[in-house]
């Protein structure tokens, strides 16, 4: 049996890199013929992920990393105001270096009869320009979408709409009927780039999806049955492999800026709280609020009477990761810390999200609705209240609340940097609602958590889907049997 190598090209950033590496680990666990090479595109902005990748490389001998050299001509930082366009151009600037690396991998394997052969290129959403490299080298390409099947349905629909009528989306436009999404979708919950006049980058990305040999999606059949069934009946869509939940159960590794003392303080406080009594507030690696909004959150929490754990982070200059608050008294209402901190609540900076969601004291999650966070909350049976920020989070929030009934709706169309301030009374209602002990949402989420765990086990839907993907890459018809 020939050994084979899969080359992954993830976008830089935790939301893309972490699930990519977890999926790579799943593949090598399933088949000892497979090894993985990760082409590591360096982030334009500082990150804390280097220790995470080093730990993976040290613990998994069949996963290796090759750093892609930084290009000399990079898009200016000001373009980050349109993240989709910025990242697309930044990734495109890496194509020559990536082509050189993969060419060397292919030629070295061809010159040795017992070496590992390159069997496929697996690219991220923002890396679809690398499909051209795969075509030039006659290597099959696959898309690994770290988001969900509903988002895939949306992206597949974009080029079709654009061909009929050049897209210029306004939030007040009529709802769209999108194959794969049950309810008509209002433009106010579209990804931000589509409603701020910069949608060309998204359309360009989406137009490449159908050129791949297959699309791997971080979801599972039981969660998104409608969309996945539709994909399987459309011959114009490449085979779709729902392989999720692909989540990192040890998220502390991915964020080395969290020191052990901070983690211990959080977990010790949770250990002292009653079961399912704490609402957790966390808004992702790029989520933050101005001081005016922070005060309203604090007042809403206090009015709710609920115990809370709040990961509070403040805005930083454009394109940089939000920072922990250096002086809580400056941004919180007078006397708030004295009345709540350590008693009814705990405020921290970066937090070990997976460990918190897994804790028996956690009963609800006020979240930005990033897809990784949604999967983690479902896995642990913790219901969400929606407060989306950026990327496709508004669409995620809409579908979780309106289509799937697995989240409580606070806001669906909030956008990071918005001048709109969510008031304390609205936050109070959202917190009280998500903490309701016997709500239908909680029951649905807990049941879906059980289905998620079954899906990834032997005999489960995602386990089978991973097997089909492996068979397509290295099976009878691949030339690598």
From Swiss-Prot:
It comes from the Eukaryota. UDP-alpha-D-glucose binds at residues 285, 350-351, 368-376, 390-393. Its EC number is 2.4.1.-. One of its GO terms (molecular function) is UDP-glucosyltransferase activity. Optimum pH is 6.25. Keywords: Glycosyltransferase, Transferase. Optimum temperature is 25 degrees Celsius. InterPro entries: UDP-glycosyltransf_plant, UDP_glucos_trans, UDP_glycos_trans_CS. Glycosyltransferase that possesses chalcone and flavonol 2'-O-glycosyltransferase activity. Converts phloretin to phlorizin (phloretin 2'-O-glucoside), a potent antioxidant. Possesses glycosyltransferase activity toward quercetin, isoliquiritigenin, butein and caffeic acid. Belongs to the UDP-glycosyltransferase family. This is UDP-glycosyltransferase 71K2. It comes from Pyrus communis. The lineage of its organism: Eukaryota, Viridiplantae, Streptophyta, Embryophyta, Tracheophyta.
């Amino acid at each position: 049996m020939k050994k084979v190598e899969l080359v992954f090209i993830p976008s830089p950033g935790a939301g893309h890199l972490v699930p990519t590496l977890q999926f790579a680990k799943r593949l090598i666990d399933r088949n000892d013929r497979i090894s993985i090479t990760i082409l590591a595109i360096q982030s334009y902005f500082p990150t804390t992920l280097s220790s995470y990748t080093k730990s993976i490389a040290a613990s998994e001998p069949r996963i290796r990393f090759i750093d892609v050299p930084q290009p000399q001509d990079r898009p200016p930082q000001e373009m980050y105001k349109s993240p989709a366009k910025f990242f697309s151009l930044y990734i495109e600037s890496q194509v020559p270096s990536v082509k050189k690396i993969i060419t060397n991998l292919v030629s070295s394997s061809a010159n040795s009869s017992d070496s590992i052969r390159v069997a496929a290129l697996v690219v991220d959403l923002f890396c679809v320009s690398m499909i051209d490299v795969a075509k030039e080298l006659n290597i099959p390409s696959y898309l690994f979408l770290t988001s969900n099947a509903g988002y895939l349905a949306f992206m597949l629909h974009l080029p079709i709409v654009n061909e009929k009528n050049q897209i210029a989306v306004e939030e007040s436009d009529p709802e769209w009927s999108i194959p794969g999404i049950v309810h008509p979708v209002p433009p106010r919950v579209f990804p931000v780039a589509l409603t701020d006049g910069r949608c060309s980058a998204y359309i360009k990305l989406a137009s490449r999806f159908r050129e791949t040999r297959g699309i791997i999606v971080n979801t599972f059949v039981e969660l998104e049955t409608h969309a996945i069934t539709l994909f399987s009946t459309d011959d114009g869509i490449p085979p779709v492999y729902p392989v999720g939940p692909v989540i990192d159960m040890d998220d502390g590794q991915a964020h080395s800026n969290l020191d052990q003392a901070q983690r211990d303080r959080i977990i010790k406080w949770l250990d002292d709280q009653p079961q399912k009594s704490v609402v957790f507030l966390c808004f992702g690696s790029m989520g933050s609020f101005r001081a005016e909004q922070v005060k309203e959150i604090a007042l809403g929490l206090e009015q709710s009477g609920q115990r809370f754990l709040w990961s509070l982070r403040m805005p930083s200059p454009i394109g940089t990761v939000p920072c922990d608050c250096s002086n809580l008294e400056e941004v919180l209402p007078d006397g708030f810390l004295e009345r709540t901190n350590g008693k009814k609540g705990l405020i921290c900076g970066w937090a070990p999200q997976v460990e918190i969601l897994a804790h028996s004291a956690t009963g609800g999650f006020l979240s930005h609705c990033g897809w990784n966070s949604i999967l983690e909350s479902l896995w642990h049976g913790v219901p969400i209240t929606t407060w989306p920020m950026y990327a496709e989070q508004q669409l995620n929030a809409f579908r979780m609340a309106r289509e799937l009934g697995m989240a409580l709706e606070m806001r669906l169309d909030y956008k990071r940097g918005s001048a709109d301030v969510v008031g304390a009374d609205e936050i109070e209602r959202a917190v009280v609602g998500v903490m309701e002990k016997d709500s239908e949402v909680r029951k649905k989420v807990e049941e879906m958590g059980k289905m998620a765990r079954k899906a990834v086990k032997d005999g489960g839907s995602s386990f089978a889907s991973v097997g089909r993907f492996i068979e397509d890459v290295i099976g009878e018809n691949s030339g690598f049997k």
